[in-house]
Amino acid sequence: MFAIAFAVVLCLLVSVDAKFPEDPKPCKYGDGECIMKLCNTLFSENSAEGDPGLNLMQLDPLKVDRMVISQGESSSPVGITLTFTDNLLYGIKDQRIVKVKGFGRDLTAKHEVKIVTKTFSLVGPYNIQGKVLILPISGTGQSNMTMVNVRAIVSFSGKPLVKNGETYLDVTDLKITMKPESSHYHFSNLFNGDKALGDNMNVFLNENSEAIYKETAKAIDRSFGKLYLGVVKGVFSKLPYAKFFADES
């Protein structure tokens, strides 16, 4: 999940910074097919362990320091504040980019990446307070939130930013939409460790997982969008926009 937001820009950065003879070559502006193939190759071969020679950090599992999902709309049967801290995200290595749009010369244009993956599992400490389909829920402990057969769309846009005579892409807007085929949840230590209540709630959550995800999808997408806007801004601030692509002069 974490790397979805900046998969393409990270791959472009890798291809620019790689120094050895066998390194992948940068793609031309707007060459979606090239960008897609480059990224899929890099992720499948290097995401599990990383590759210092390619300047590619470990992506599977990936550390997620903190993420808050807040669903508080009064009309919704689900109203929760769910906080994940020091989690690990598994599944990046199996993701595949299936379509890329944008990444042309126009810095104000929209960029879009479509991705599919078998599973995404976010594992680690959590805190939750609120209600789920009218039932109260509270707890602090370990959690596992897994999404299966996920289709995701990442889109972002920006504006030119001139620094020291060079033009950078200043990313100003990023959105993520995820559509899993199914989702599964497990939260330990619910209701102050009451095992009976906790077990029943976990059963309830999974029996109603489709309805629960539908109610929380927008909140989940917003949380990831806010989190990774800063990440993508940081990637594009490293180099002038033109440096991410092959020299066509």
Swiss-Prot record:
It is found in: Secreted. InterPro entries: Haemolymph_juvenile_hormone-bd, To_sf. Residues 1-18 form the signal peptide. GO terms for cellular component: extracellular region; extracellular space. Expression is largely restricted to head, with limited expression detectable in cardia and crop. In entrained individuals, expression is observed in the brain cortex (region between optic lobe and central complex), photoreceptors and antennae. In asynchronous individuals, expression is seen in third antennal segment and male-specific expression is seen in the brain-associated fat body. SMART domains: JHBP. GO terms for biological process: adult feeding behavior; behavioral response to starvation; circadian rhythm; feeding behavior; male courtship behavior; mating behavior; response to starvation; rhythmic behavior. Keywords: Behavior, Biological rhythms, Secreted, Signal. Induction: Starvation and circadian clock. In the heads of entrained flies, levels fluctuate daily and the cycle phase is delayed with respect to per and tim. Cycling appears to be linked to the endogenous clock rather than light stimuli. It comes from the Eukaryota. Gene3D superfamilies: Haemolymph juvenile hormone binding protein (3.15.10.30). Its main location: secreted. Belongs to the TO family. Participates in a novel circadian output pathway that conveys temporal and food status information to feeding-relevant metabolisms and activities. Involved in male courtship behavior. In the brain-associated fat body, transcription is enhanced by the dsx and fru male-specific isoforms and repressed by the dsx female-specific isoform. PANTHER family: PROTEIN TAKEOUT, PROTEIN TAKEOUT-LIKE PROTEIN. This is Protein takeout. It comes from Drosophila melanogaster (Fruit fly). The gene is to.
